[in-house]
Amino acid sequence: MISQFFILSSKGDPLIYKDFRGDSGGRDVAELFYRKLTGLPGDESPVVMHHHGRHFIHIRHSGLYLVVTTSENVSPFSLLELLSRLATLLGDYCGSLGEGTISRNVALVYELLDEVLDYGYVQTTSTEMLRNFIQTEAVVSKPFSLFDLSSVGLFGAETQQSKVAPSSAASRPVLSSRSDQSQKNEVFLDVVERLSVLIASNGSLLKVDVQGEIRLKSFLPSGSEMRIGLTEEFCVGKSELRGYGPGIRVDEVSFHSSVNLDEFESHRILRLQPPQGELTVMRYQLSDDLPSPLPFRLFPSVQWDRGSGRLQVYLKLRCDLLSKSQALNVRLHLPLPRGVVSLSQELSSPEQKAELAEGALRWDLPRVQGGSQLSGLFQMDVPGPPGPPSHGLSTSASPLGLGPASLSFELPRHTCSGLQVRFLRLAFRPCGNANPHKWVRHLSHSDAYVIRI
């Protein structure tokens, strides 16, 4: 049983507020939650907080805070599951979950909350069941068009004919508009991996972890069967080995409850009949043993003149992907000593950009080709008490507050574990001659890629 549900933007602005029981302090509770959240040290806040007999449970999704409050002794895990399911429902009915889509679909969100929760008690979170009661149509930012070849979104892929699913393709609502009779039968399948790495200052690898998911978003009628074929050499655990080549191994794996595993052991095929909407077909984890080299290596060189406070940082970034692969939206973030205000730079290519932002050096590289090497020379003044006279720059100990460096990036058509989708086959038979469209994409991106200086 919950008392309130509200959605806040990343800046704390209330987008949605619903009081189910009238036993709380009104909308001020949302402001109280955000003040407590921002007042905590560090970036990671607890998902469960307590204040004057009221429990706050929240998740963060797409930059939004989804929060429930309760004064009862309710399992926090059940409320976290409810919030996760609400996030999926909002994505299904609004097309995607973000500040813009929520603002455009306030009436639809409140109608969903009225059907999902009655006086704070959960009634249903089934997309299929709710579609019989929801009357409000979603307001989308722009109509979907195959001629929209903008940047590829989360559920999009490059096909063999070099056609690209537009970014809005999978961001439309699962339920078609009543006036739209041309709803396309489409399936979007993404293999998404998050890479966490910690590299010591001498270049040795201290930690590596891959968290992977196979995500599905289906616009087919519910009950349509599909078969997903994974790499045949895929194995779970170190003791299992399949095929004659090097195995693609993960440490742990879990499946959605709707997945039929009858063909998994013999042929690495997943069978399922998904409902309309989004679900995670499979999750897996791999630690400490990647089958391929790390995508990036950083070679830093720091020279600091204590007398004048002159700091020179030379960064050489090497991309160890295959030459046909590339990394997109690469950003290096390097914390600097306190008080640095000036920056001079020499970059190896004009596409790069570097600037000071919030006490750190931010080096942006829009696109990095596999096998390439980029560099940047950065000079700055570190204010502080004068030191003994020095004859030029030296490679002495770095000033306090420098580093560690962190990288963020996206690797399209690449998985760090080596897992691939061999095929996606549908048993769906459309009424007309149009066959369902299938889009498959593989993507890796950084989660915490840290290099000590």
From Swiss-Prot:
This is AP-4 complex subunit mu-1. It is a peripheral membrane protein. Its main location: Golgi. The gene is AP4M1. It comes from Homo sapiens. GO terms for cellular component: AP-4 adaptor complex; clathrin adaptor complex; cytoplasmic vesicle; cytosol; early endosome; endosome lumen; extracellular exosome; trans-Golgi network. InterPro entries: Adaptor_comp_med_subunit, AP2_Mu_C_sf, AP_mu_sigma_su, Clathrin_mu, Clathrin_mu_CS, Longin-like_dom_sf, MHD. Keywords: Endosome, Golgi apparatus, Hereditary spastic paraplegia, Membrane, Neurodegeneration, Protein transport, Transport. PANTHER family: AP COMPLEX SUBUNIT MU (PTHR10529). Belongs to the adaptor complexes medium subunit family. Component of the adaptor protein complex 4 (AP-4). Adaptor protein complexes are vesicle coat components involved both in vesicle formation and cargo selection. They control the vesicular transport of proteins in different trafficking pathways. AP-4 forms a non clathrin-associated coat on vesicles departing the trans-Golgi network (TGN) and may be involved in the targeting of proteins from the trans-Golgi network (TGN) to the endosomal-lysosomal system.
